[in-house]
């Protein structure tokens, strides 16, 4: 099996890279990841990297033929020719790769793993031309792939409505095995994780800095906002910008926070950051859009709010009742950890859709 991504999966510091690494870990043996990356070389025998000097669409497009050639050399003599295309980048890269692999390796089974409905995001944040091209190519990718997946039943319904294409469910999931949390709290802080370069994250981070934190620090002068993910250069008196951090550090930051606040107004797919927080036993405050597609055991917590005043009031209550709320969600984290276990989800997906390729399933 060949996995292909058009973004770096190492270091493992983004939601999409977390999902890919977890999926790869629990996929049956006989596998390799092919990626386009601008980051320094990592010694990993299971990773084939096509390097670019700088992460730009043009540089990626120019390197696609080389990436396809590397995949071809790997799959050509394989008994089980399976290509998983991780669709967490511009759809053009996925379309180009699928189109040519289908022609040079006709017996290769191509699985398109959709992380979101990209045309929705492009419609909101890109110009009209890019949106139309994206929608056309996304439709073609769903049509020509042998199997396409979605991350939630909500996305599944949307894709059928937009493209009249049936998809298989392969939820975003994580691997929390052997994760050790250090219970250490020096300051009180809220946390938001995600690159500022991604427009939905930018809007959420700006909302926290301009609408939420100025009100909260009137009652809690020492309260901080911790952000991770990189791309942010602004200064605020309450802000602690951690940039890109390791998964170990990230999970400790999430667990020890007063809460993770995710005021997303727009987005597609399911938020790995929220799945991680719920599975770690952290308190989550989110908009309806932020928590969309996630199967909740119960609410309050997590708290689902869509306007400024309720968000501020709820965070105030969380800070005042932290220990009580943490105790309440201690059992809930077991539910989320099992429900969104990549090991369980991958095993189930293969048994339902690829059992003819993998006898052990």
Predicted regions and their residues:
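Membrane-proximal helix-turn-helix segments that form the acceptor-binding/catalytic region
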Residues: 72, 99-103, 112, 118, ...
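Short hydrophobic beta-strand element within catalytic cores of glycosyltransferases
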Residues: 273-276, 283-287
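A charged, aromatic-enriched C-terminal amphipathic alpha-helix characteristic of glycosyltransferases
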Residues: 323-355
């Amino acid at each position: 099996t060949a996995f292909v991504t058009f973004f770096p999966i190492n270091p493992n510091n983004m939601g999409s890279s977390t999902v890919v690494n977890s999926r790869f870990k629990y996929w049956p043996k006989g596998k390799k990841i092919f990626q386009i990356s601008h980051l320094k070389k990592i010694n990993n025998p299971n990773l084939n990297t096509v390097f670019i000097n700088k992460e730009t669409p043009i540089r990626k497009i120019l390197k696609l033929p080389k990436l396809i050639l590397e995949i071809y050399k790997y799959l050509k003599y394989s008994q089980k020719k399976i290509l998983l295309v991780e669709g967490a980048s511009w759809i053009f890269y996925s379309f180009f790769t699928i189109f040519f692999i289908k022609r040079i390796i006709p017996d290769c089974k191509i699985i398109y793993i959709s992380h979101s409905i990209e045309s929705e995001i492009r419609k909101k944040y890109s110009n009209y031309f890019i949106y139309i091209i994206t929608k056309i190519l996304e439709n073609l990718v769903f049509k020509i792939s042998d199997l396409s997946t979605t991350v939630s039943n909500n996305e599944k319904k949307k894709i059928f409505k937009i493209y009249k294409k049936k998809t298989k469910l392969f939820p975003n999931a994580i691997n929390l095995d052997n994760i050790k949390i250090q219970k250490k709290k020096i300051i009180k802080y809220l946390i938001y994780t995600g690159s500022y370069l991604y427009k939905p994250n930018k809007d959420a981070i700006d909302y926290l800095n301009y609408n939420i934190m100025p009100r909260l620090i009137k009652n809690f002068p020492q309260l901080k906002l911790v952000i991770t993910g990189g791309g942010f250069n602004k200064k605020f008196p309450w802000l602690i910008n951690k940039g890109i951090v390791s998964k170990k550090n990230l999970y400790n930051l999430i667990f020890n926070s007063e809460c993770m606040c995710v005021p997303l107004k727009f987005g597609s797919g399911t938020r790995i950051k929220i799945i991680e927080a719920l599975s770690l036993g952290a308190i989550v405050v989110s908009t309806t859009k932020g928590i969309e597609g996630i199967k909740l055991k119960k609410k309050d917590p997590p708290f689902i709010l869509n306007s400024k005043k309720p968000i501020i009031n709820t965070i105030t209550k969380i800070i005042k009742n932290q220990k009580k709320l943490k105790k309440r969600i201690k059992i809930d984290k077991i539910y989320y950890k099992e429900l969104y276990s990549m090991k369980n989800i991958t095993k189930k997906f293969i048994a339902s859709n690829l059992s003819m390729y993998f006898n052990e399933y």
